[in-house]
Amino acid sequence: MYNSNLLVIQKLLSTNAYLGHRIPTSDFQGYLYGFRNEMAIIDLEKTLICLRRTCNLIGSIISAKGHLLLVNTNPEYNKIIQQMAKKTNQSYINHKWIGGFLTNWKHMKKVKKHFQDFSAHPNLKDAFTSSPFDYFPRFKKMQKCFEGIMTHNIPDCLVIINANQNSMAILEANQLQIPIVALVDSNIPNRLHKLITYPVPVNDDSIKFVYLFCNLITKTVILSKRSQRPKVKVKRL
């Protein structure tokens, strides 16, 4: 077990997952290994523990036929998130969070249906030489919002790649007691950290780690689908 842990930590080291910011927030202190050249160093053993907890949670949700919503606002990670969602058949949002997306879910379902009816209109493509959404700003905004949503049901878990930029998503999920998995860097505000049920302490600016993390979640989802059982209500922590 020790050798296995060591190999994983070496892999994490290669992604620069341990590099924090100069001034970590007080709630993040428990995840620190120390400081080097005035930079916070994240304890990767604790990162590994959090990754295992995350995989256990996601595995149990998928096994119970639950659904994930992947949330990201960093354009650098867009393709990674899209590929992950496609491989796992989960939902994703790769743009700024729309207020009320979760807390006003019934309304959002109606808006989504309106968008789908509009985009599926048989004469729509023939009427425009370019994308019809270019002529309808409202529907172009809807396209960004709904293009990655694969379910009509409210998600069973949020997986957030950049927590600092998604405070509204965190607040809404917390209000509805939806479990939140989030990559948290050393500058995560205390008020947000308290709301995240499954934080993963890490350098969230590392594209190598984000790729590694998404690959891990993808494998967890695929393996868990093989042992799916009738859906049950997942206990909210």
Swiss-Prot record:
Q: Which GO terms describe its cellular component?
A: mitochondrion; small ribosomal subunit
Give yes or no: UniProt keyword Mitochondrion: yes
Q: Which UniProt keywords apply?
A: Mitochondrion, Ribonucleoprotein, Ribosomal protein
Q: Which domain of life is it from?
A: Eukaryota
Which Pfam families does the entry mention? Answer: Ribosomal_S2
Q: Which family does it belong to?
A: Belongs to the universal ribosomal protein uS2 family.
Stated name of the protein: Small ribosomal subunit protein uS2m
Q: Which organism is this entry from?
A: Marchantia polymorpha (Common liverwort)
Q: Which gene encodes it?
A: RPS2
